[in-house]
Amino acid sequence: MKPARFAPRAARKGNPATGLAAYRLGLRAETLAVLLLRLKGYRVVARRLKTPAGEIDLVVRRGRALAVVEVKARGEGDAAAEALLPRQQRRLERAAAHLLGRYPHFADLDLRFDVVLIVPRRWPRHLADAWRP
């Protein structure tokens, strides 16, 4: 039996229950990240933006800053902080290039890459300007 097209990628690879749980965890983590960023004065430009290079979790803006945000949810703080590998950073950089190509009015803004770490029983951590390409 073929998995549904809307099923999360993890569900298509293996156990559907595990994949669905991971998908829901990701949605909850992104919702918490949106709340945190709104409280800090950011405006959400896009959520789960799909580009040929990959998906961007959040695109937010505050003033002249445009941030491509990767949301990481893990069971422990250190695991969340270490979850963004250099390969994923390059993928996000390519996705951001597609974003700027598709929406040229963003090209005048200061682009940066942020990470929001979501860990159970702790406040979410926003790492502004987490890395530079």
UniProtKB/Swiss-Prot annotation:
Transmembrane segments: none annotated. Signal peptide: none annotated. It holds the Pfam family UPF0102. GO terms for molecular function: nucleic acid binding. It comes from the Bacteria. HAMAP family: UPF0102. Belongs to the UPF0102 family. This is UPF0102 protein Plav_3586.
